[in-house]
Amino acid sequence: MEDKFSNRNTSIEFLRLWFMLLIVLIHAYCHGSGLNYEYLYSLGSDWSTAHHLGLLCIGKCGVTGFMFISGYYGVSLKWNKLASMIAMLLFYVLLLTCFGGYSVSDMLKIIFHPWDEWWFVSSYMVICFLSPLLNQGISALGKRQFGITIIGLLFYEYVGKFISQDNSHDTMFLLTIYLCARYIRMYIAPPDIPTINIKTYRNR
């Protein structure tokens, strides 16, 4: 389904780049400093070390923000885009194997079971594969049904995981953010947001 809101606001594109930078910085902070996520979560229990957890939370806003923008404008299944993502994944796997101290078994795990360390790439690809089904389903649902679905997903992701103390992010988390953004774009955001067609602008 072609999104009728395909024109992009250049300010939003810069915001997307900012969210990507936050994602890179938080990974550099966690992995570059040798700290794991479980240890960073434990630092929040003491005010003297809580700022470390605060930095982690700010970085995680990059994941939510990036996926929100993707959902706001819509994701479509494009094989060339998926091929580029897979090629990028294989490139970084090769770099980590050659220079990052990863073994061959680690490399195979990343390629064939990338849901742990590389969860975002895997989850985003799943949403790309599901996008035709998602777009058709959203079109078939009314505003009320779509809203009830969003409320249920938000309850599961935030209330349910808060109760279970599960801090993980997964495909369901990205899907929830994606659908929330679609709902806001369809039913809440004003339809006359000024936009610039970036492709047309570049061809001038």
PLM region spans:
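Membrane-cytosol interface segments of multi-pass membrane proteins
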Residues: 1-153, 194-201
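Juxtamembrane membrane-interface segments at transmembrane alpha-helix termini
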Residues: 98-102, 159-164, 182-192
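Membrane-interface helix caps and helix-loop-helix hairpins in membrane proteins
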Residues: 109-115, 159-169
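Short, aromatic-rich membrane-interface segments at the entry and exit
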Residues: 143-146, 165-172
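Membrane-interface alpha helices of multi-pass inner-membrane proteins
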Residues: 154-158
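Aromatic-anchored, glycine/proline-accented short structural segments
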Residues: 170-204
